[in-house]
Amino acid sequence: MRVVLFGKNGQLGFEFEKLLKSRCELLALGRADEGGDLNDLKGLVTRLHSFSPDVVINAAAYTAVDLAQTHEQEARQINALAPSEMAAYCSQTGALLVHFSTDYVFSGNGSDPWTEEELCNPQNVYGQTKFEGEQLIKQAGCKHLIFRTSWVYGEHGKNFMKTILRLAQTKESLNVVDDQVGAPTSAPFLAKHAHEMIRILQSGREDLCGIYHLVPDGEVSWCGFARWIVQNAKNFGAELRLEPTSIRSISTEKYPTPAIRPLNSRLSNAKIKSVLGTESFQSWDQEASDVLYKLVF
């Protein structure tokens, strides 16, 4: 199997490269590599045709949620137009496109987990561009797997877990929102289960193409996640100035940001668990423990 991976230097791409480099003929591309800059659509398409992959994995994205509010064209280029070109290639050649999307395609209303079939209504530019990317991929008519996920973190790259660990070294108190609820999702978890789905489709189950919500089991608020990070880092032996009890909960209303954040980021993972033949995934905190341990040590 020949695979092109875009976004090799991001937290998800990093995990995919580790997972796949000994399992297939892999071309992993970062922004500085020929064909790896998603702002250069012509170069991207040329690289795809020269390598002729069976699978295209797009682990690249414009994820600066607040910055996207004032850089809409740049966000759209990366999150919608580049995936559209990948989808066009896959439609022409029969390759499989694997793409990652977000809980931000939903409005954030209510408290029930969002299913794959529910109406999308993104509330910020980032969510709008990610939703447009989904639509363009589907319109291309290619074989595709689109994985919506939430609150991604990992050993590599910038993320909430690493930010909290850094702040906890010097801060004596911290305010974190407690009315946004979702499932923190580790990059290794995403790479592992996405790879399982790729193998299933490549075995002939093209009827399983489509959108899947890929998150671990359970839910937590950002404030609860922050407290969990600090407490468990201390349990692992990290010397931190910040105590979990000194992390104060505040409402989203009292922490205004340029981009609206959804309060309900819960995603139902029932569909993908059914396809994979499992009744449960690991809980978000079990997944987080594995990554946190590596970051602390």
Show where each model-derived region lies.
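Amphipathic terminal alpha-helices
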Residues: 282-297
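NAD(P)H-binding glycine-rich loop region in Rossmannoid oxidoreductase-like domains
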Residues: 38-78
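SDR active-site strand-loop-helix element
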Residues: 6, 29, 59-60, 97-102, ...
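NAD(P)-dependent short-chain dehydrogenase/reductase
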Residues: 135-183, 187-196
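Mid/C-terminal beta-alpha module of Rossmann-like enzyme folds, strongest
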Residues: 193, 200-256
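NAD(P)-cofactor binding segment of oxidoreductase domains
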Residues: 70-98
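N-terminal Rossmann NAD(P)H-binding glycine-rich loop of SDR-like oxidoreductase domains
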Residues: 3-21
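Catalytic helix-loop patch of NAD(P)-dependent Rossmann-fold dehydrogenases
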Residues: 77, 82-85, 105-147, 151-152
